Every structure is written in structure tokens, then in C-alpha cells.
Amino acid sequence: MNIQKYRYKERFVTEYDVSEEIHQFCTVKLIIQPILENAIYYGVGNMDADDNPRILVKGWRTDNDIYLAVSDNGMGMRQEDVKNILSDNKKVPKHGSGVGLINVHTRIQLMFGAEYGLIVESEPDEGTTVTIHLPAIPYTEENCELLENGVKKPGNEGDDEKT
């Protein structure tokens, strides 16, 4: 984020509201970076400083699930675009292809199942929130190594299912 803030000449503010509790769980590499980049590039990157461009990163745990949400107060999207952005047959306007989002969504679902992935909420001229939904996998060296090697769910090493 520091590089992006420098690139955009500190034109936006980033706030974090991440529960300490979720620091004890593993995640998949490179899933939040493309979402943050989208929030900057398509959300707040072209806003005037007078419009108070802001990105909020939230993280919390609910039962056996972890949620990481990136919200911006940028231009937002039409509901039609929101519905299509994560579909294989997506039809999104040229200003955003959605490839980064569909890539992250697909990787999460391949590893953990269809109940996990991304949730996209947006309103035109209000902003966008992309929420990452993951299983709560305890942070251990073994679990993290299994995720790195593509084991879908730690504890299922013998399933022969790899990504």
C-alpha cells in the first residue's frame, strides 16, 4: 500500500479495522493484493482529494469462517456489472475486465469449495466492497505449507486433490 500511496501522491486514505483474532489463521497468497489494486485503480485513483477518497480494510472471524473486506468510496458499479463480474460469462465494461477478481474467486473456490470466494457489493457513485470469505484454518507451519503446496483443505492431505 505504501508504494501505491506514493504513486497516487497520498491522494487517498487507507484505514484498517482487522480483528487481532484472525492473525492466528492461514490464508492463501496473493488474494488481497489484486482487490486492493482494484479499489485504488477503479475506485479512488481518479477521485479528487476534495472528495476524500478512502479505502477501508476490515477483517473478522465468524464461527469457522474468516472475512476480509476491502471497501472504497469511489465510483461504484451498476448492479448488472456486479452480477456479472464473477461469472464465467461476465460482461463488464471496458474500464475494468474483472480478470483479477475472477482469478482470486476461482482460486479460493478450487481450494476450499463453492461456499467460499468473493462477495462483491457496489452502488454507483457510492463505492464498492469486495469481501473475501475463507475457512478459518489455524496458523501452523504445517497448515501453511499444505496451502502453499495446493492441498485444498489442511487435514485432507490424502485426498489427492490439488489445485
What is each of the regions a protein language model found here?
Residues 1-121, 127-133:
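Two-component histidine phosphotransfer core
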